[in-house]
Structure formats: structure tokens, C-alpha cells
A protein has these predicted regions:
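NTP/phosphate- and nucleic-acid-binding module
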Residues: 1-176
């Protein structure tokens, strides 16, 4: 609109108009007018707000037993998610935290990881969904037997068994 220039002209007591010699449909000069101004603005805060607004989702579904469930998930694209991977030992005992810590140490020099052993695994998955972590790896008793882990994908909630040695490459390929 011409609001900014009109207000500036009003308070500065100077004319800020454009004279146009072109002719209108009636054959008369268009004359003086205050031009409209298009103000574009791009800033990091607006970009960040846009990403967060688009990423925030509340999902609802019906479980197999017929009950309703829901979750809050930040579907931040994996490449810009602040935390790429959560490493979650199933229990705080039986050597699982030690394996998880070792895996954490292997991955943390390549991307930001988060380690958590508090609460049930389902609650930990939900917390990671809410902060936008695209991958969760669960270290369980089977990990001790065959060196595989369960990887969970945030967007689909799909889980699969993979070799512990593949975790870093899978996450790096998706995120970096």
C-alpha cells in the first residue's frame, strides 16, 4: 500500500509523489500519485517460526485394541533437526547402558546425539517425537546376543532390526 510513504510525507511535510506523463483511457495524463511500496522481509526468526509451524503436528489413530491414541510430533526435516539420533537403552542394567554409551561415543563426533535411560521406552519415544529427533535406537538384550538394535523412524513410527555397526551410516546418510 501507500501507507508508509503517505505517513512519511504527512509528518515530514514533504511531497513524496510520482508524476506520470502516461495517458489514461480518457487521453489525460495520469498525473501525481503516491506509489505503493512492497516491503519484503526475511530474517532468521521468521524462517525458524515457519519451519516450527510446519513441523508441528498432532497425530491421532486407533490402536489394534480399538482405543484412541495420539502424539505430538515435530516433523522437522532430518537435515535440519537439532538432534539427529536418540540412543535409548531398554534398561538401566545388564550392561545395556555400557553398550549404549559406546554407541553414543561413536556417533557424537558425526552428529548431535541424545542419550536417555529414564522412564519406559514408549515415553522416551514420545519425548523424542515431540522435540523432532528423526531416529531412535533402542539397545536391548538381543543387542548383547547378535549386535543388532531396533531403529525407530519418527515420521512413520516404523521399527526394524539393524546391525549396530550400521546406525551411524543410516543416520548420516539421512541427515548430513
Amino acid at each position: 500500500t501507500d501507507f508508509d510513504l503517505s505517513q512519511h510525507a504527512k509528518y515530514s511535510k514533504k511531497k513524496i509523489q510520482y508524476f506520470d506523463n502516461d495517458l489514461n483511457e480518457e487521453g489525460k495524463p495520469i498525473g501525481n500519485y503516491t506509489p505503493f511500496v512492497v516491503e519484503t522481509s526475511v530474517g532468521l526468526d521468521r524462517l525458524f517460526l515457519t519451519v516450527i509451524s510446519l513441523a508441528y503436528q498432532e497425530e491421532k489413530w486407533t490402536k489394534e485394541d480399538g482405543s484412541e491414541d495420539s502424539r505430538v510430533v515435530m516433523k522437522i526435516p532430518a537435515k535440519i533437526a537439532p538432534t539427529k539420533l536418540a540412543i535409548l537403552p531398554l534398561l538401566k542394567k545388564d550392561g545395556l547402558p555400557e553398550i549404549a554409551t559406546q554407541s553414543m561415543n561413536e556417533c557424537k563426533s558425526h552428529f548431535h546425539c541424545f542419550y536417555e535411560e529414564k522412564d519406559a521406552i514408549g515415553k522416551r519415544y514420545r519425548r523424542m517425537d515431540a522435540i523432532g529427533t528423526p531416529f531412535c535406537v533402542t539397545i536391548d538384550h538381543q543387542t548383547k546376543e547378535d549386535n543388532t538394535v531396533t531403529i525407530r523412524y519418527r515420521d512413520t513410527m516404523k521399527q526394524e532390526r539393524i546391525a549396530l555397526s550400521e546406525v551411524k551410516d543410516i543416520v548420516a546418510k539421512a541427515c548430513c
